[in-house]
Amino acid sequence: MSQWNQVQQLEIKFLEQVDQFYDDNFPMEIRHLLAQWIETQDWEVASNNETMATILLQNLLIQLDEQLGRVSKEKNLLLIHNLKRIRKVLQGKFHGNPMHVAVVISNCLREERRILAAANMPIQGPLEKSLQSSSVSERQRNVEHKVSAIKNSVQMTEQDTKYLEDLQDEFDYRYKTIQTMDQGDKNSILVNQEVLTLLQEMLNSLDFKRKEALSKMTQIVNETDLLMNSMLLEELQDWKKRQQIACIGGPLHNGLDQLQNCFTLLAESLFQLRQQLEKLQEQSTKMTYEGDPIPAQRAHLLERATFLIYNLFKNSFVVERQPCMPTHPQRPMVLKTLIQFTVKLRLLIKLPELNYQVKVKASIDKNVSTLSNRRFVLCGTHVKAMSSEESSNGSLSVEFRHLQPKEMKCSTGSKGNEGCHMVTEELHSITFETQICLYGLTINLETSSLPVVMISNVSQLPNAWASIIWYNVSTNDSQNLVFFNNPPSVTLGQLLEVMSWQFSSYVGRGLNSEQLNMLAEKLTVQSNYNDGHLTWAKFCKEHLPGKTFTFWTWLEAILDLIKKHILPLWIDGYIMGFVSKEKERLLLKDKMPGTFLLRFSESHLGGITFTWVDQSENGEVRFHSVEPYNKGRLSALAFADILRDYKVIMAENIPENPLKYLYPDIPKDKAFGKHYSSQPCEVSRPTERGDKGYVPSVFIPISTIRSDSTEPQSPSDLLPMSPSAYAVLRENLSPTTIETAMNSPYSAE
């Protein structure tokens, strides 16, 4: 089943997550129509190869043209219109930057895999539970309900203000009518009494309505103040925490559109309220009287409403997408000097008057004194205007795409880190400033990214990413740049949940409870990973017992191995991966001979091995583990092909493949058949093919096991011998001679 078909079968809560990352950059219609073709292209490689990206973009447009031809025959007018529009947008947007479309599509496919993995994982860790609590959802609904109620109340006071204006005009008309009456009519006692009574009643009604309107406006200001400080800003902080979690591989964060709707409605309501207060001032200027409530209350209400507007705007300026290098989309907030990164800002108050009128300036470490001697400046376009065209949903946004951090030389002439921290523990901040001028108000806004780590060499990326993980799982403080002076510990349950996210986001499949238990045992003697705490040093700085590397270095090497060499096998769930040798033997001891499992090496960085079970002649259960394969060997031969072609020479027997069933009882070819690069090579005699022909050759993974040993002596050595030549040797040499040659000290050369 294709990945897209699997996505379409997800529950609605997961489909909503999928909907979040499909926009005009890569419309879902294209994903649906070209699903099979899209999934067979290597978009990740193309995202770093301009030539390949250009070819894929052209092929994508060709595929669209073919779809257009098909739907034209079906006379589907709406689909024809949409496809033509999409093709025009894609060609215009990506013609000069084909690598960007590869990055976008690669990210979408990766997020699909992560969501599919999350949907299939029964485990929900403490961090994810906290983000999905029912109280949070209830508060979201309450915020939206109260914002709507405030908007309705302001509409009511708008009607009250107009009624007051009409009432005052009527009073003014009657008063002026009296002034123009004949002197005789004015002297009439009856007429005079009636007119005075009428005017007094109208004045009393006017006074009552003014007080009533001001009372309603006061209530609106009070409710808005309470809503903002007790619920709306809490909701914004929750979104920022969800963003932190999503940045380190957790569930996709959403809810920003709902927040924008609330912020915008409140801003519109407050500006409308200010206009109503200005109208009341005009009415009071035209006509006032003793005890008039407008002069006594209007100024204070206007001041409070204006303060709320300032506060609302200051909180509405957010970093929608944190700084990230396009070449490493799964490692946001790690930036390399002189390499471009992207970052996106958004104003949650969407007013048409602000489109293209708000210019944002980016800077780094503004007014911040870091512990490092390293100082940076931003090169590239660091001032841009916000516009609704920057976003598919019309929000007021700005995206910086060409910023580059450049390290400055210190005044002493030194360069680099001379403080107490490693470079990968130094935190920096990117600040964004703008000014809003609207309806007579001038509001200065400033916001900052989450802390970023600056590296000068890609080899520093793994440890820099570890710092980003630890920071964002440990604190909600977005500006604690001295965090690593005294980094707090985290619970083991939290950390292991984040480790599972690394696998689901980076290689498309998270970890199950058994795998997490093994990691827990690796980090501590406890197997219950919901309890206990872990320090930063234990995670990333101290070597594992008896090893020359840290826990994080070991895990990162496994992630890299999966990503580059065994990704399809991992996604299919056929790699048990994290299992100790002791547990491995418990699992295999009662299984059929030839049953094997795949696990990651605990002693070799970035290594994967397989262990199989068989029986000796006297019925004794034996276990054999091949020397771990690393990325060097896997670059020469695909792992699935190794499992298919692996041979063992044991005692006087001919070479045979001992791998029959993937644990627990899956036939090997059924599990891995679709990943074989070709059909198994048949061993045959060499044939005469003339001067122009060659005898075909293949790499054969082969091991020898002595009769007095249960372990392969030359595990995973690749024998560069043609099948034909090997067949000739078998016919002309005895098994003993072949075994002697295989055991030669030169056999592994």
Swiss-Prot record:
Q: Name one Pfam family in it.
A: STAT_bind
Q: Which UniProt keywords apply?
A: Acetylation, Activator, Cytoplasm, DNA-binding, Nucleus, Phosphoprotein, SH2 domain, Transcription, Transcription regulation
Q: What happens when the gene is disrupted?
A: STAT4-deficient mice are grossly indistinguishable from wild-type mice. However, the development of T-helper 1 cells in response to either IL12 or Listeria monocytogenes is strongly impaired. In addition, mice are acutely sensitive to methicillin-resistant Staphylococcus aureus (MRSA) infection.
Q: Which SUPFAM superfamilies match?
A: p53-like transcription factors, SH2 domain, STAT, Transcription factor STAT-4 N-domain
Per the record's keyword annotation, is DNA-binding included, yes or no? Answer: yes
Protein function = Transcriptional regulator mainly expressed in hematopoietic cells that plays a critical role in cellular growth, differentiation and immune response. Plays a key role in the differentiation of T-helper 1 cells and the production of interferon-gamma. Also participates in multiple neutrophil functions including chemotaxis and production of the neutrophil extracellular traps. After IL12 binding to its receptor IL12RB2, STAT4 interacts with the intracellular domain of IL12RB2 and becomes tyrosine phosphorylated.
Q: This chain belongs to which protein, by name?
A: Signal transducer and activator of transcription 4
Q: What is the lineage of its organism?
A: Eukaryota, Metazoa, Chordata, Craniata, Vertebrata
